[in-house]
Curated annotation (Swiss-Prot):
This is Molybdenum cofactor biosynthesis protein 1. The lineage of its organism: Eukaryota, Metazoa, Chordata, Craniata, Vertebrata. Disruption phenotype: Death between days 1 and 11 after birth, due to a progressive neurological disorder caused by massive cell death. Death is caused by the absence of molybdenum cofactor, resulting in elevated sulfite and diminished sulfate levels throughout the organism. Mice do not possess any sulfite oxidase or xanthine dehydrogenase activity. No organ abnormalities are observed and the synaptic localization of inhibitory receptors appears normal. Long-term rescue results have been obtained in mice lacking Mocs1 thanks to an adeno-associated virus-mediated gene transfer. The modification N6-acetyllysine is found at K198, K528. In the C-terminal section; belongs to the MoaC family. It comes from Mus musculus.
Length: 636
């Protein structure tokens, strides 16, 4: 195995300095002011009493399926000191202005509120949380919150060895370290930075300080590090590690792609061939990991099966992004800005109502989307995990399937990198014009939807940065008579049997003028019927597929791709809709695109009509079409 020499060095390095501490909690010296052992025993009895006589869990943190959310993940920063290839472009990503990020006091205010309502575990994430200057102070102040039992941290390990002693003294009692390879050269290739030995020093320091287990997160990618599976497992023989193998989220385009993704069952089979005595360990109801142990080994391994076997039914997690948005589901499409309400002077009761409403809308699984395996890329580094960006476009865009929608945060932090904007420009549907040439910002939140792989979420990236190449405008050759009427004036379906099959693409648009009241409710996802934009996109996709049943003389077309894109325009209180369809065949797909856009617009109307009847559906029109005997068309 290629990784063996480096693996041996790694294991020797870790073993040579490990102290063999076996306590289940971090080993720390008593600090001044700490209670004596008898007092601690008294506290334990009190804790036992409180557990036996606990009040009902907070209704604000309990969703409609009875899940009690006692685990909060807080992103301390969007910044990272690595540039992992599967995470972000080498130049990084645009960041939120500092003024829009949560301050330390705001973080602690929200943490205090959640802990008061029943959260007993907080994990600090990023970006990379250890590059935040006041991270030790934050941990210390969180440690003072009554009722908070666990303070954890997920880190890339670069700064861990230097900061961990102070963090432990401040109250940090759980550490997860990300490491995808045991080969130094491969590490540098993956993260585009040096630092492998710093990460190993961090793992060693965590073991030395008595953290047990030290959790090591490894994203397994076919063709990159799956050959190191056994080496990672072997580390647990003499070290108190919990090596957690994470299924790679295969965002190579928009389809479920097994080429890079290594499933949990495949990994398990590989490991069992080497260690047939591998035993399954019991797990907590809310655990995301399937734990295993090899008899006689000091550590264990786990699998996080977010792709092949979801764990939504027992989810107890909530997330707060670095800019203060509450996410109730990692794969969900709605965020609520707690920062804005805090800064507007909301009371604790008002904040709890906002939080409770968001938790109450949480779906049964994966934000109500059919299956995570059918979903495409979504930005994640800004909610505490990695942003999956592909280095090259898929071979054929026509292979894309539609994607259930995502709500986008307005800030520039979610704008596409120049690299992805370039891919969008070169490989999007030919000649499709952007809906708007202007930024829709003006200080109000913007929600952005698309079924393309990680499309731009800030309107300026949809303008000059991703404009399609110039193309001839105006109609191409046209017929001088109606094609669906015979010589006697009767309706007649065109015979397309003799026409050649060519690639056909059409883009249509529509606009819904909502008015300020309905627009605000849609923008904040507060409609009683639910998320208007999500439902509208689904309706648009469905309508495209049913066009031949709605338009009497329209041929049935086997569509290879449908995209419905919705964007909020705060300057006009409008929803802008763009629908595109692609197929290969003897007839065009203009009607499919127009029907899709129109139905999406009508669905927005239906979702909002209880709020206002003064809603206008307008500008339903063809934007462009390519393929066919009459040539291409691009609206000027």
């Amino acid at each position: 195995m290629a990784a063996r020499p480096a693996f041996g060095i790694v294991r020797q390095l870790l073993r040579s300095n490990a102290r063999g501490c076996s306590s289940g909690a971090p080993v720390t010296q008593p600090r001044p002011g700490e209670p004596s052992r008898p007092t601690r025993e008294g506290l334990s009895l009190r804790l036992q009493f409180l557990q036996e006589h606990a009040a009902p869990f907070s209704a604000f943190l309990t969703d409609s399926f009875g899940r009690q959310h006692s685990y909060l993940r807080i992103s301390l920063t969007e910044k990272c000191n690595l540039r992992c290839q599967y995470c972000m472009p080498e130049e990084g990503v645009p960041l939120t202005p500092k003024a829009d990020l949560l301050t330390t006091e705001e973080i602690l205010t929200l943490a205090r509120l959640f802990v008061k309502e029943g959260v007993d575990k907080i994990r600090l994430t990023g970006g990379e949380p250890l590059i935040r200057p006041d991270v030790v102070d934050i941990v210390a102040r969180l440690h003072g919150l009554e009722g908070l039992r666990t303070i954890g941290l997920t880190t890339n390990g670069i700064n861990l060895a230097r900061l961990l002693p102070r963090l432990q003294q401040a109250g940090l009692n759980a550490v997860n370290i990300s490491l995808d390879t045991l080969v130094p050269a491969k590490f540098e290739f993956i993260v585009r930075r040096k630092g492998f030995h710093k990460v190993m020093e961090g793992i060693h320091k965590a073991i030395e300080l008595g953290y047990k287990p030290v959790k090591v997160n490894c994203v397994v990618m076919r063709g990159l590090n799956e050959d190191e599976l056994l080496d990672f497992v072997a580390l647990t023989e003499g070290l108190p590690l919990d090596v957690r193998f994470i299924e790679y989220m295969p965002f190579d385009g928009n389809k479920w792609n097994f080429k890079k993704m290594v499933s949990y069952k495949e990994m398990l089979d590989t490991i069992r061939q080497r260690w047939p005595g591998l035993e399954k360990l019991p797990e907590e109801d809310s655990s995301t990991a399937k734990a295993f142990k090899i008899p006689g080994f000091q550590g264990q391994i786990s699998f996080i099966t977010s792709m092949s076997e979801h764990f939504c039914g027992t989810c107890n997690r909530l997330r707060i992004t670095a800019d203060g948005n509450l996410k109730v589901c990692l794969f969900g499409n709605s965020e609520v800005s707690l920062r804005d309400h805090l800064r507007a002077g909301a009371s604790e009761e008002e904040l709890l109502r906002i939080i409770g409403a968001a938790v109450g809308r949480k779906k049964r699984q994966h934000a109500g989307m059919f299956n995570i395996a059918q979903m495409k890329n979504r930005p994640m580094i800004l909610i505490g995990v990695l942003l999956m960006l592909q280095d090259s476009p898929p071979a054929r865009w026509s292979n894309f399937s539609w994607d259930p929608l995502r709500v986008r945060n307005p800030s520039a932090r979610q704008c596409l990198s120049d690299q992805m904007a370039s891919l969008w420009k070169r490989h999007c549907i030919p000649k499709a014009l952007p809906l708007s040439q202007q930024c829709l910002g003006s200080g109000s939140p913007q929600r952005h939807y698309s079924s393309y792989p990680d499309p731009d979420t800030h309107s300026k990236c949809l303008s000059t940065g991703s404009q399609a190449p110039d193309a001839p405008s105006g109609p191409g050759p046209t017929s001088n008579q109606l094609t669906h009427v015979d010589s006697a004036g009767r309706a007649s379906m065109v015979d397309v049997g003799g026409k050649p099959e060519t690639e056909r693409v059409a883009v249509a648009s529509a606009m819904v003028l909502l008015g300020p009241v309905a627009f605000k409710l849609v923008q904040q996802n507060q409609l009683k019927k639910g998320d208007a934009l999500v439902v509208a996109q689904l309706a648009g996709v469905q309508a495209a597929k049913l066009t031949s049943q709605l338009i009497p003389l329209c041929h049935h077309v086997a569509l290879s791709h449908v995209q419905v894109h919705l964007e909020l325009d705060s300057t006009r209180h409008a929803v802008l809709i763009q629908a595109s369809c692609r197929a290969r065949g003897p007839t065009g797909v203009e009607m499919e695109a127009l029907t899709s856009a129109a139905m999406a617009a009508l669905t927005v109307y239906d979702m909002c009509k209880a709020v206002s009847r003064d809603i206008v559906v307008t500008e339903v029109k063809l934007i462009s079409k390519t393929g066919g005997q009459r040539g291409d068309f691009h609206r000027a």
